[in-house]
Regions:
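Catalytic pocket-lining loop regions of alpha/beta-barrel enzymes
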Residues: 1-65
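A generic helix-loop boundary/linker signal
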Residues: 18, 45, 72, 89-90
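Mid-to-C-terminal alpha-helical segments outside catalytic/metal-binding sites
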Residues: 58-63, 73-110
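Active-site glycine-centered loops adjacent to acidic/histidine catalytic or metal-binding residues
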Residues: 69
Length: 110
C-alpha cells in the first residue's frame, strides 16, 4: 500500500479491516504515519481489544474511519466499539463520519 500511496499522493487509500489483529493494526499505523493519504477502516474491531484507541494514538484521529462489515457483523456492536473507546468525543465524531466526509468532499472538488 505504501508504494501505491507514494505513486498516487493525491488519491486517498483506505485499508479495510485495520482492527483485525494487533500485528495488522501496527502495519497499518506505520503506513499511515509515512503516508498522509492512507486511512485505517475499523471493521473487524471486535476481535482486538482497544484497537480503536491504538490506531488513533499511533496515528491521529484524522486517519481512522468507522466501518461495520454489515451484514456480516451487527453494526450496533461495531458502533459500540467506537462509542465506548477511551477517546474524546471530538475524536469519536471524526472516526464515526467526519473523516470520511472530508475525504469525499476533497474527492468531489473540481
Amino acid at each position: 500500500m505504501g508504494r501505491l500511496a507514494e505513486r498516487f499522493p493525491n488519491m486517498s487509500w483506505i485499508i479495510a479491516h485495520a482492527g483485525g489483529s494487533y500485528a495488522f493494526a501496527e502495519e497499518v499505523a506505520s503506513c499511515i504515519v509515512e503516508h498522509p493519504n492512507v486511512y485505517a477502516e475499523l471493521t473487524l474491531t471486535p476481535v482486538t481489544n482497544r484497537v480503536v484507541e491504538y490506531l488513533v494514538e499511533a496515528t491521529d484521529d484524522e486517519h481512522v474511519l468507522f466501518g461495520t462489515d454489515a451484514p456480516m457483523r451487527d453494526p450496533r456492536q461495531q458502533l459500540g466499539w467506537v462509542l465506548w473507546a477511551d477517546l474524546p468525543m471530538e475524536s469519536k465524531g471524526k472516526v464515526l463520519g467526519l473523516n470520511f466526509k472530508r475525504i469525499v468532499d476533497r474527492a468531489l472538488r473540481p
